[in-house]
Amino acid sequence: MQRRRLGRSGLEVSAVGLGTWQVLDVRDREEEARHEVVGAALEAGITLFDSSPMYGEAERVLGDALCKYGRDSATVATKVWTSDDREAEHQTEDALDFFDGRIELYQVHNLVAVEKRLDLLERLKEEGKVCSIGATHYSRSAFAALMDVMRGGRVDFVQVPYNAADVAITEEVLPLAEELGLGVIAMVPLGSGRLVRKAPADKDLEPLRGFGVETWAQALLKFVLSDERVSCAIPATSKPERARENARAGEPPFFGSEEREYVRRLARR
């Protein structure tokens, strides 16, 4: 697994991480199976795990899994997501409880009350509970506001959507991140599963075999990771074997411009 520097955070993270939206929002008997996904990811070299209080039980389930399989091997990225000051305090207190008193990467989710939440996260950083601060948004309509935050100098990295069917961030967000030295975490690199469900025929992957591509999901991940401005891509999965497969996409070699365009054409079919 290749490791990449996450912008000004000073941290190195695995090129492929693990997202937890929907897949770790479980209770009771389903929790053990999801713990195994986290264990498989760690075993495969994945170090970055992304969550949010917006994701239901995901933070708690992830925290329990990391306690079982190796919190010290993980870089936890979670978020604060509320316009209410008291709720923001509660969210951060809960997250610190879930993750053994420290959060490596703390993000303002979807820029909600961004300036006030940055104040809170900066205080936690001063207290030694947070290592690095970022901001996220999923919508192209919010990219101008996100870029204002990037220019403000208060974040070390951003999390934005990037996949073979959605390259909007390449127009302005990625160039600005590169200029400012900010890290980039790519959300929905598989299009929230939509692109994987539209997999091309195996014969169409033959031109990509020399890059270690075994599956369409790996081709999609290598498309994102072949952009050197991306620090980490965070696909989500509920299956240990898929976590292992996804992790292998984080190994060089990565695509050149010809292969990237080929994957884009396949994704548009």
Protein language model regions, located:
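Acidic (Asp/Glu)-rich catalytic clusters
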Residues: 7-10, 63-73, 93-101, 122-126, ...
